């Protein structure tokens, strides 16, 4: 995998190579910058990889929901994401840094992380630069990273976690639709 710093000026997209597999790649036309793979078809445990490291994400708690973020192979939380009831939430890192996950539009189709000064780190919106008919049932997103964010040490982790949160949101919406119908 390539370092994100080499992607400055490129169009980054999250793509799903195979429709029925819960595996995703962060790509430009010519390079691979990250991956996210769910361990089970219906579970919430996922492993994310980039040139900066490997992490696991796991949703936990019912009355007090959260997503734990750990370095792969470790049992200590590196960070915890605390969702808010109506969407969005806060990521609290072990070093004290915090980032807000929030909707970028009224419909909640575009999401991104911002720092505590409310400066956007990046945004993700569903779709692909070049959509094909075979992509119709795949989860994909266009990623727009602020140029000031490429030097941010947490950027690779935030990109992986952001996509994990979008996939979890899609799964929750599909489950709700199935229950209601």
Regions found by a protein language model. Give the residues of each.
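Intrinsically disordered, low-complexity proline/glycine-rich segments
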Residues: 1-181
């Amino acid at each position: 995998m390539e370092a994100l710093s080499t992607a400055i000026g490129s169009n980054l997209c999250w793509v799903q190579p195979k429709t029925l597999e819960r595996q995703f790649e962060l790509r430009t036309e010519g390079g691979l910058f990250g991956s996210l793979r769910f361990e089970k078809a219906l579970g919430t445990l996922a492993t994310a990889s980039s040139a900066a490291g490997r992490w696991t994400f796991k949703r936990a708690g019912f009355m007090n929901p959260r997503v734990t973020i750990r370095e792969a192979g470790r049992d200590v939380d590196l960070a915890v994401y605390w969702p808010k009831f109506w969407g969005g939430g806060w990521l609290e890192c072990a070093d004290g840094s915090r980032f807000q996950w929030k909707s970028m539009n009224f419909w909640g189709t575009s999401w991104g992380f911002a720092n505590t000064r409310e400066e956007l780190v990046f945004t993700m919106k569903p779709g692909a630069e070049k959509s094909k008919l075979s992509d119709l049932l795949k989860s994909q997103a266009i990623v727009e990273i602020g140029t000031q964010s490429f030097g941010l040490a947490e950027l690779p982790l935030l990109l992986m976690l952001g996509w994990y949160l979008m996939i979890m949101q899609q799964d929750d919406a599909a489950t709700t639709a199935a229950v209601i119908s």
